[in-house]
Amino acid sequence: TELFSAKPHVFLQKNHPLAQKEVISLHDLVPYPRLNFVQGEYESVYFSEEPFHSIPADKEIRVNDRGAIVNFMLGLNAYTISSGIFPKYLNGENIIAVPLVENETMHIGYVINEKQELSELGKIYLDELRKYAPF
């Protein structure tokens, strides 16, 4: 079920050489390390969190810890591409989101088994996610 759609953004540290640009292209990103978040060894490409993850990169770092992504962004001038939503508690004051010029849309949603009912905690979680919808 789709919660909302969003245009991809490039997350990078506020002092990154590309940080002052109003928009960033994939070509602009070539010299910098790309960070890909993976949730497990057998993660399906159909449920990848990053758009453009299949586009070749000269330098790519795969991480499974969100804190590590922030540390790599701060220490290596690395970047990741995501929805534009970034929690402040993950060093958010030092990380910025710049729109990506590519003509793509991310669809943010969830999958549940149709034979099961969503728990109360699950409903609360989805209500919290909806607060991030870029309306």
Annotated model-derived regions:
Residues 15-24, 102-104, 115-121:
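Short helix-loop capping/hinge motifs at secondary-structure junctions, enriched
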Residues 26, 31-55, 118-122:
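Secondary-structure junction motif
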Residues 51-60, 94-95:
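A local structural motif
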Residues 1-2, 6-7, 67-115:
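Beta-alpha-beta core module
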Residues 23, 63-66:
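Structural motif corresponding to alpha-helix initiation and N-cap regions
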Residues 27, 31, 107, 111-135:
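Extended ligand-binding regions for polar small-molecule ligands
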Residues 1-34:
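Flexible hinge/capping segments at coil-to-helix
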Residues 14, 41, 83-86:
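Short secondary-structure boundary segments
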